Amino acid sequence: METKFNFKSQICTSREQSERLLALGLKKETADMCWMYGEVLSCNPPELTVDIPAWSLHRLIEMMPEEMYGGLLCIFKDSIRYEEMLMDRLEAHFEVVGDNMYENAISCIEWLIKEGYFNKKYLCEK
């Protein structure tokens, strides 16, 4: 008996998500994949000016700081947060919850950039 799976896992940022990351100021060279001209996904960094950079979830997480002002990066199935263990409780400095981990990661990166915690080596110079 053959089992058929209907996986619909997202393997990289969509074109729209990629445009959002570029608008936040991420260097296209930080992408580990790209949407090539003509709707084809490539597992190579962008080479042509018409290629649209794409980021794997692993790469997005890799660019996030592991810790900041005492808070540690915590990643769960449906959320990303920076939390700090205090004497009697956990203190969340930032948390985003949602079904799409790519959207969660992009929202987290957006917050990190806004707060000045995102590594500037990944950002275009202004």
Model-assigned labels for residue ranges:
Residues 1-126:
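Glycine-rich anion-binding surface patch
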